[in-house]
Amino acid sequence: TKLLLKYYDPEDGEIDINGANLAEYTNSSVRRAIAYVPQNIELFSKTIYDNIRISRMDATLDEVKEAAKKADAHEFIRHLPLQYNTYLEEAGNGLSGGEKQRIALARAFLKDSNLYILDESTSNLDFATETLIFNMIYEQLADRSMLIVAHRLSTIRDCDLILVMDHGKIVERGNHEELMAKNGRYAELWNMQQGIFRKRKSEPAPQVPSAVVEEDDDGESITY
């Protein structure tokens, strides 16, 4: 992904986009054309409004709100003391992982690009939150191109083309059904991850001991 964003130049070969060598484009033009959501979200000591519109500084408050709604961020922002004028602590301390992720996605939606790169962007989230966010991503970006880097295969099951990499090399390619039929590396990883997920779902919830209530000599209740 860093090569696509021109943070580095390829040491060998070239990267073509729509038949044109990426090296022919300026760094700024490439980064303006791509919406990038990384694994580690960078939030600044500014208002939520400013943190979202950093991808497009001319955006109005209404446009920022619309992007936040698409990212399922508007509701939690609306319940903050100053809503979009709430000032964030350094690195977004005080927000949950899911809330940070929604702000990052709102940035991407506000940018309104033709190509979105999601680089392990939900790997720090729990399964339920990740599923919710990806369902929203697929709904909002159905008519855009997406490049998704992920280790949790459930998040890329519906992709048109899946490239399986091992030690830096592509070892398999195809959609989910094709790769499962090959019964290769992808199928092995899929079955392993699904087995872990089923095991977690079947594990009983931890038992919480019942409270014991007694009264002391003064008639006051004591809970153990």
Predicted regions and their residues:
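Activation segment of ePK-like protein kinases, specifically the conserved APE
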Residues: E42, R56-M57, A73, Q194
